[in-house]
């Protein structure tokens, strides 16, 4: 068994602005797990919000991850590799994704079947409109024409209302708002009431993760549901935040493994919380992996691959606004032949 990797720069259709940052590109790492003439593939999309860096990921991979000897066993291999990954959740997810892909290819089954899902009922995915020049909103809304739900990034108090008004000039589609920790309590109380008049479905992560008491207070007065993102990393977080939020946003790159994502779903259901499946800006590789879990959640925000113009993989599609999984075993993802630099 061996592990290989490639660094790849994904380029965005538009500058991607949120409350705390703005980017035109992101570097990711594609990892390959090779054994018995089968290649499992995974994606690592590190986030500086969680103190992750591409340099640390590459350093670990370059210096070598020790692999178990003998016949491949999924559980033993994962338990052997996991402690070596320095708690970098995105790297954990990339390796875990490659292991699941390898296992599915070996057994001739798609990932969702390995997880016990027989006939997945795929949800609608939202399409993200990031913070940017107000003059570009019309273009972005037009690009989002196939999607019935928009996720609009807010978190800049001087612009927030103008952004929503501008979106509403072009469409009456349902809006989900993501403030990315950009508000304070007084402003959020005002915005929740104001947004309720603009066909907004819910608000995601209004405050910094360390302001849980503010979220608890807001929830008592908000006419809109409140979802956790930065407060909802792993399953252990859910019991802590359940009285402050109505729902959670699960992202594979945050939680570190398919198993942990499923644990989060189970715990959220136990507390009667709503569940959204989200993503970072990723290629179709990572988005397809997440889509195999989409049957288990209430709504999806799996559009990271739609926001880039050099996606090197072919995987999940969107048909009439709904996610549609590819055929094939494992993740079912194929390399686009235009991007031969990612071939082994």
Spans of features found by a protein language model:
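Metal- or metallocofactor-binding catalytic centers and their adjacent structured scaffolds
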Residues: 7, 33-106
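Predominant activation on well-ordered alpha-helical scaffold segments within soluble catalytic domains
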Residues: 58, 62, 96-101, 165, ...
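Catalytic alpha/beta core domains of metabolic enzymes, predominantly
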Residues: 210-303
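Hydrophobic faces of well-ordered beta-strands that scaffold small-molecule active sites
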Residues: 40-42, 123-129, 148-152, 175-179, ...
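Flexible C-terminal active-site loop/helix
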Residues: 1-12, 28-30, 36, 280-344
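Conserved, mostly hydrophobic/aromatic
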Residues: 31, 37, 95, 108, ...
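Short Gly/Pro-enriched turn/cap motifs at secondary-structure boundaries
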Residues: 19-24, 329
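Metal-dependent enolase-superfamily TIM-barrel catalytic cores that perform enediolate-based chemistry
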Residues: 113-222
